[in-house]
């Protein structure tokens, strides 16, 4: 691959606003991503009255499997042939608005031929005209829940509930990855791209040849199975056993002249978690087969307790007004893929010479927090309500990814490359990046909500109404800014991933005589999110805020032999809002995905 050369450039304020790039290589990528999901579930629930006790037993089993397929195909000219690319209208930031013009016509199937265009997998010895990833996930849950409830007269405590839950969850990820090679040819063989479709190449402004690669394995391509350090990292299994014993008392009393109802209780939760995976020494991974890239199977885990008290009270202020108070210790469990064992490691190729690696953490603890919630609610008979709520969560522990000091001695072999220079010369000590628990953080904010039927204004508007809510949430956790040269660097503060600062929902509706018609909009501000990269690994990125509009209409037959039958139609993302990623400026997106509108039509019958 030759270095690019910019010529015929127009420069304004230090920015090359237009020019021609030579030694440029055009690669037409046509991808297909799909999945087949299967879900089975069985449940059994039974209640039994024994004297003054009401008992219940609930048994459930569920199993979900998902087989995904990700075809990546490349087309263009042979590896040795170069092209040029002209561009205009660049101002230094508007990447998605630049106009590009290539020298060759990549919509011409005589130019865009299926082949190994770049020799990405190592050249003639390991040709790659595409890639096929087929991850397989199996997730099984078994659970039992036993409860017993009895009425009592212990002051404000009017009933007691005792319970026990036990959940067993097993999740595993495996699959097959491999290089696609043109069938029956040499390393850089070419094949015609089927069909005649063309499509615009992202935001480039020019068209390229397009096709659907499904069904091409065996007819156009043959598969060479592949394993390497990254692929081994996707093979893992996790077992989680959670036992919960709890006691709860129902409350009904009077405090400072205000009647209240609620509950108080405590849970004792025991967790036993085990993760499995593979360790790969990159120095020994010299190829992409199990023989040339050996791996070592490892398992690890942890056991721990959480004690979680809680209190919920609802005060009756009179005139259909209520004040609600909630206080509790809560936990939120880690994603199971973060609990996997296994890692890959090797000598750092940049910066300080030191062993570095990455993987999961079977000893990871959940998010732990203390929460306090306060809300005021005003009802208008059975017609509507308004409410205002404030909430605060003190994060005791949270989960983030960061490097930590680690001794790789148990995994070192005679072929492992150790640092030759610097402070870590000859040392098995290094840095290991994994999900880990941090301490301290806050989440707080408020929420306003209202449901207002228009019949409160006029009986002529009976059936019409509006629902609206708005939340404003601030959050922050501190992460150590860790680099190879300064392990204990300054801390940086970031918001909790996945959480928008502001979220607003609006729903206009008509509900009467069996008709339900609604238009809804959800607006959220930009946030720090997670997306899957080209290797199916989750990566943090900023997501631009969006407004999504949904429409729905249904009718339930009110009489006759079809009474109880409902017909419905729904349109989701009716305004076709795009999914936009960005780095610093939300008005300069780095990636755009248009998921389009989704329509649902259906019928149901209620017995």
Residue ranges and their predicted role:
Residues 5-24, 84-128, 174-234, 293, ...:
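Flexible glycine-rich, low-complexity coil/linker segments exposed to the extracellular/periplasmic environment
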Residues 184, 522-532, 555-607:
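C-terminal beta-signal and adjacent terminal beta-strands/loops
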Residues 1, 59, 65, 124-131, ...:
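Signature of Gram-negative outer-membrane beta-barrel scaffolds
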